[in-house]
Amino acid sequence: MPTDPNSNPVSKAGLTPSSINSNISEVQPTTGLNTINAAAGVKVKETENLRANFTAKSSLPAGSEITCTPQSSPLLSSTPPTVSKSLIKAYPYLIALNKILGVLTWTDDTSYISVLLVTTATLFILYFENFVIYLGHLSIVGLIFLYSIFRSYVEKEQKKSPTLDDVVHCLTTVSVRADMLLFPVSSLNLTSADLRRLLFTSIFLSPGYILVCYLLFPPKTLLLILVIFFLTYHSSWSRVTRKLLWRSSIVRAFCFYNTGLIFESGNNEKSSLFKTAMNKTNKKLKEVTRKAGGKHSGPVRFTYVLYENQRRWLGVGWTPNLLSYERTPWTDEFLNEAESPDNFELPQLNDDSGMYWRWIDKTWRLDLTNDGALQLPSSKYKTTADPKPDEGFIYYDNTWKNPSTEDSFSKYTRRRRWIRTAELVSPGDDSSTDSASLPHSASETVGLTLPKSTSISDVQSVNASGNITTSAETAPDSAGTAKKRKSLRFDATSTVYEEGVSDLKNVKETLEGGATDKKEE
């Protein structure tokens, strides 16, 4: 006898008594397969095994409801009870915070609340005095009323018994919206130098700000502009407007000169031209070391160069606080921004060769000759690790022109040169750091023909194309001219110092000729 489809709804999901939503009617025992129509329209074939899991008749009275216990999250078993209890109590507050962040970031289900907030803030600022005069005594009562509404809302949400999954989902949403709200500031990645530059620029432009407040924008109007800009920053039409305005070079220049900050993504990610040049240099030197290390692996050395830049301010003296549009306090030879000696780190090679950089000099040393611009007695050291405050500087005018070795009232800028030698070595290279010359096998492999007196420790700088410049500047000759600096290029073609080789050959021939004459005599 078939069962009544309206009296035997069976859930498809489970076969336990707790998963049944209604009573099961009495079924005649049969050996065949009978069909049971569930309440959801799902047909389940009844077998003896299926009927054996249930009693012939439910013990619950007719019309009673069975409460289904929700399935617990796997996080519940691994989360301490105290943490779970704290999260459940904080859940209503998280919902309120999520709602506020959604309104401020314009990511709520509807944007009408955000528009209403902007309108209310505008009216409050414009008619603040009237509001205080007529409704000031009611503001405290209004705040208490809002708190009571929020308290009832919290109690109502706590009675709903949220699951741990709901709390985790709400926490994730709050975290994402908080990051979105703070992204305009966090994306700048401001360093201490950037903050100092911003503070200095703001103080420098204070007279202009005061004039603007007195003549153009009263404090109430300026506050209204700032509040509207903040409340509508994340709206879609505001983002489109900023993108269109940012295409103008005038707007970008205005932002730069008023803040001293560079808002380009390249600067935010710290991918300056200096680091780009260093990456190219490391790649070149890595190839050279790999080729030179076939039979006799030796370290490749060169000297890092940093320039310290300062400006004179009337009443203050020489300070590293420069103008926002000029060079930074520390630069490389190409005026690219660089880290200070205290924060300078050797680059890391992200490859499988295992080679790494290490310092040869214990500390940064000041080049007292400033790359040969200053003449020193032969008895005096050319570098020092503990210089005096005004030692080793070259002085310039206000536009970094007309260099001079002497300070004067017409000089407002100056800079000096710091150097430190490093070497690129392989993990198994335990050779002494005193051997500074490049192995002969390396010269043959790379295609470099060097004089015997030339060593890698004389290398002074590396530019973005991988050119290494040496400091092999000889003393001035009788005519008062010095030989030009020579450069080593790590290219496919070999570089030959024809002048040096010819001089060595001439000296060698002269010595051999003199020895032959003495033997004949």
Swiss-Prot record:
Glycosylation: residue positions: 23, 53, 189, 279, 463, 467
Major localization class: endoplasmic reticulum
Phenotype of null mutants: Results in aberrant peroxisome formation. Reduces the number of lipid droplets and leads to fragmented and clustered mitochondria. Also results in retarded growth and reduced mitochondrial activities.
Residues covered by region (Disordered): 1-26, 425-446, 465-486
Keyword Glycoprotein included in the entry's annotation: yes
Topology with respect to the bilayer: Multi-pass membrane protein
Sorted UniProt keywords: Endoplasmic reticulum, Glycoprotein, Membrane, Transmembrane, Transmembrane helix
Cellular location(s): Endoplasmic reticulum membrane
Biased composition (Polar residues): 429-446
Record-linked Pfam families: Pex24p (PF06398)
PANTHER family listed in its UniProt record: PEROXISOMAL MEMBRANE PROTEIN PEX30-RELATED
Function comment: With PEX29, contributes to the formation of endoplasmic reticulum-mitochondria junctions which are important for mitochondrial function. Involved in lipid dropplets formation.
Family to which the UniProt record says this protein belongs: Belongs to the PEX28-32 family. PEX32 subfamily.
Name the UniProt record assigns to this protein: Peroxisomal membrane protein PEX23
Protein's organism: Ogataea parapolymorpha (strain ATCC 26012 / BCRC 20466 / JCM 22074 / NRRL Y-7560 / DL-1) (Yeast)
Encoding gene per record: PEX23
